[in-house]
């Protein structure tokens, strides 16, 4: 869950996609004090500054919930601060020896020691600052959970671990919507979680609202719904919910495949019904076209070769959407989250659908005005299960990034045929895109946000899944123009 402020904070709830999304945020930071490059993004909306031992920290303003054992090598209070009481790097004085030495007990102490979780290769490369080595790792086949590709460090207050249920890679133990409801209502969890929310709210100057991501098919849906109910009652802020459907489904503990399919269906139905009550707007996300009893029909993206059931790949696609879509309320001169939700939930219809073009299929030497004039077909692919998004009678919020004003149209002296087009009068990318949607979508309204800066992608983003038609600047290579006309 994210806390939004303007600086306006947004408080975030978590799922695996969220960690790729937060990685994007940190990749766009500029740590060079002599740099003259100015960012269009206000990072204070999702991040907070703090101090520890006179050192400045900058961490996501968020709360995450996961099961016991999911953190693997990460301590339950996070890895932002070094534990000063234990000499972790001293091989002659292990953690176990230090703990034994600190206990005033005469008798022999019985020790039950769990096997230490191995540190993933990517995390080892980060800790040793071998960034180039991290780029060469086969992350697609080695990553199984979000700590494996975590780049950002989190405040101890952000981490909430469920003690009653244990994480398993091959099955899900927190199974039903009702189990999630009961978990949130347990005294230890609700008190700790709500105290952490309150702490973030108290340090915020002007909280816009809450941005929530969670798995909709298991017990975390119940946890999330109770969380939203609490936030709605306690704070009366805008709540933007993004229920997520994974690309493949684990069976639940003590349930066979048929029973697990039925449980997922019921969990999803309960989730959608309750989100209509407690969220200002919710948008289901998945790279699968069908996510009801069965989860299948992977979406196709013309320039992306991804493995549909690989969480590392699918989370990168959804995080790309979230990072781009959220720019509307994360820019320095942006509107509020409440404005987005109000515009899209017309007639109090709380559910919306999403689509993405990854990347935008414009040629690297082409102007936007020429691209829009020649393009035919669907520009974007739906990433909401069961939703085929039409073009007529729709309300939409569109964000386009990476096209500088110099690529809008030719200068007047070399414009030639462009001068005959109605769009030549447009003075900005957003204005030209707005005109495009007015002309191509009947009885529709579109709000367009345009950002010149491209999405900065670095390891651990799976850059290898873009095919060779994409240039290093993110545009389609010029010689491929005939292949991409009409593709979205």
Regions found by a protein language model. Name each.
Residues 2-488:
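Terminal, contiguous helix-loop blocks that mediate binding/assembly
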């Amino acid at each position: 869950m994210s806390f939004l402020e303007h600086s306006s904070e947004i408080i975030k709830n978590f799922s695996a996609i969220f960690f790729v999304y937060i990685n994007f945020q940190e990749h766009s930071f500029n740590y060079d004090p002599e740099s003259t490059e100015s960012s269009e993004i206000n990072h204070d909306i999702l991040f907070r500054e703090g101090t520890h031992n006179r050192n400045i920290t900058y961490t996501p303003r968020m709360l995450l919930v996961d099961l016991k054992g999911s953190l693997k090598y990460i301590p339950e209070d996070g890895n932002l601060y070094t534990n000063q009481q234990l000499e972790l790097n001293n091989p002659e004085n292990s953690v176990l020896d230090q703990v034994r030495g600190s206990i005033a007990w005469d008798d022999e102490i019985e020790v039950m020691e769990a096997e230490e979780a191995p540190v993933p290769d990517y995390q080892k490369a980060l800790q040793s600052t071998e960034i180039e080595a991290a780029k060469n790792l086969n992350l697609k086949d080695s990553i199984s959970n979000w700590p494996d590709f975590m780049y950002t460090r989190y405040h101890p207050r952000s981490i909430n671990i469920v003690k009653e249920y244990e994480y398993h890679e091959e099955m899900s133990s927190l199974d039903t919507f009702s189990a999630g409801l009961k978990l949130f209502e347990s005294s230890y969890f609700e008190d700790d979680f709500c105290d952490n929310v309150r702490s973030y709210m108290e340090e915020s100057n002007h909280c816009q609202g809450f941005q929530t991501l969670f798995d909709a098919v298991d017990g975390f849906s119940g946890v999330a719904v109770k969380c939203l109910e609490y936030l709605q009652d306690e704070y009366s802020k805008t709540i933007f919910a993004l229920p997520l459907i994974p690309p493949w489904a684990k069976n639940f503990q003590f349930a066979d495949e048929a029973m697990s399919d039925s449980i997922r269906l019921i969990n999803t139905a309960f989730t959608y019904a309750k989100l209509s009550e407690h969220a200002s707007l919710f948008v289901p996300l998945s790279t699968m076209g069908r996510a009801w009893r069965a989860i299948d029909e992977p979406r196709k993206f013309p320039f992306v070769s991804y493995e549909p059931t690989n969480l590392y790949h699918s989370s990168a696609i959804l995080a790309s959407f979230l990072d781009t879509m959220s720019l509307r309320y994360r820019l320095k001169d942006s509107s509020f989250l409440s404005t987005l939700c109000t515009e899209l939930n017309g007639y109090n219809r709380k559910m919306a659908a999403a689509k993405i073009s990854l990347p935008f299929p414009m040629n690297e030497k082409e102007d936007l005005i020429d691209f829009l004039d020649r393009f035919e077909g669907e520009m974007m692919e739906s990433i909401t299960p069961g939703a085929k998004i039409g073009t007529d009678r729709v309300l939409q919020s569109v964000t386009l990034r990476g096209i500088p004003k110099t690529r809008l149209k030719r200068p007047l002296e070399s414009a030639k045929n462009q001068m005959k087009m109605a769009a030549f009068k447009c003075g900005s990318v957003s204005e030209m895109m707005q005109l495009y949607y007015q002309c191509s979508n009947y009885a529709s309204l579109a709000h367009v946000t345009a950002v010149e800066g491209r999405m900065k992608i670095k390891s651990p983003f799976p850059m290898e899944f873009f095919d060779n038609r994409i240039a290093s600047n993110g545009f389609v290579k010029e010689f491929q123009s005939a292949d991409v006309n009409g593709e979205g």
